[in-house]
Amino acid sequence: LFMEKKRVYTFGNGKAEGKADMRELLGGKGANLAEMNLIGVPVPPGFTITTEVCTEYYDLGKDKVVELLREDVEKAIANIENLMNSKFGDVENPLLVSVRSGARASMPGMMDTILNLGLNDEVVEGLTRKTGRPRFAWDSYRRFVQMYGDVVLGMKPVNKDDIDPFEAIIEEVKEAKGVKPVSSTHLTLPTICS
């Protein structure tokens, strides 16, 4: 019973396994991304994990859900790699993806996002070579680490009076390096990396 259910719906290159009227199953964002592909809007390829998987996660636990999803997610990532002519984790031609949460009903500002998944200490060097823009690559990596820390590890302020731990580190580096005005856009690559 568990193995036969479709849990991952792909989209990309003008094709989609889902469509707009599948909001209950794919969430609003997933259904809209599928529909945009079907009507020809240029949307990067991706995949949606169904809303039912959230219920399975609570009922069956993380390990069982990972087991149920692994093969389909690996196939979906391979499809993105093929369409984008890049490879997840590849140092020379890296594929970076975004992980965006969604729901059946719109909840602006309530759902978390992680951008630039796929960056690590080696891949950032490859992205630097590929783009010729080291500041872009390293800033993307910083943003990934910050979002991952926030969303996955819970490294974020508990209330509005708390200081964000990542922002505190950035401010400390900017102050130590004498960066004024204190804006991350004024940080040079050597400052970011030292």
Q: How does the language model describe each region?
A:
Residues F2-L187, S194:
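Nucleotide/phosphate-binding sheet-loop regions of phosphoryl- and nucleotidyl-transfer enzymes
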